[in-house]
Amino acid sequence: MIQNNKKEDRATRFKRVAQRRTDHILNSLRILGNCSNKSTYQYSEEEVAKIFRAIEEQLRITKTRFRSSRPRKFTL
């Protein structure tokens, strides 16, 4: 029973921390979107592509961390 409570505590902590961090990321993306105002900022399509490549690459890495919690085994 104690182990079950620990798991619940870990699950509750995950939800609390993940929700706060996700909200922070989404807010940061909204703020980044403010840079799209061409009357205030000047930028090239290449610069925009570079920004989104970096974001998409980090998103891919983070998704992978959630999908695979065990090390991959080498096979020939």
Task: List each language-model region with its residue ranges.
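N-terminal intrinsically disordered, cationic/polar leader segments
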Residues: 2-76
